A protein has these predicted regions:
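Short, conserved DNA-binding cores of transcription-related domains
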Residues: 1-92
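Short, positively charged, Gly/Tyr-enriched micro-motifs
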Residues: 58-151
Length: 151
């Protein structure tokens, strides 16, 4: 029987964990997206031309009560369609990471569900007690982006 937690099981196949670091309050999971190509969000053409890399820091759901961040080594791709307005774009992992987000989708979904059951300020207080860093105003913006009803 294994006595360690295998974090890879909690992440999509396209994401590979390269390193895990931690301190008393936070866990940092360094990951890389292992896709060979990416689809342009504007025209839908798949591209294999990697333009560059950059690091993103995204908040994920807490692990064992600690604030958890994904440090994503992401690729920027060049669109192969000459008639497309987009020259470069970043890779997404559908249903998990969005190019514009500072949180994983599951973290956003949890916060939205909590906000719809309580209130934005109340859910922000609950999130802070769980070591999820957010505010009532951020939750309102998140609900608007997801086009969920505000109560």
């Amino acid at each position: 029987m294994k006595d360690t937690l295998e974090l890879q099981k909690f992440y999509p196949e396209e994401i590979g964990i390269t390193e895990v670091t931690q301190n008393e309050k936070e866990i940092y999971i360094h990951v890389s997206v292992q896709s060979k190509n990416c689809t342009c969000p504007k025209c839908g053409v798949a591209s294999e031309h990697k333009h560059g890399t950059y690091k993103r820091k995204l908040q994920d759901l807490p692990i064992l009560g600690r604030t958890t961040y994904l440090i994503v080594n992401a690729y920027e791709y060049q669109c192969d369609n000459s008639s497309c307005d987009v020259t470069t774009f970043v890779e997404n992992v559908d249903g998990f990471l969005n190019y514009y987000s500072r949180m994983t989708e599951r973290c956003e979904d949890f916060i939205c569900t909590l906000a719809l059951e309580t209130s934005c300020e109340g859910s922000a207080r609950i999130c802070r007690s769980m070591n999820l860093k957010t505010s009532g105003d951020s939750i309102i913006r998140l609900l608007k982006i997801k086009r969920l009803p505000l109560y």
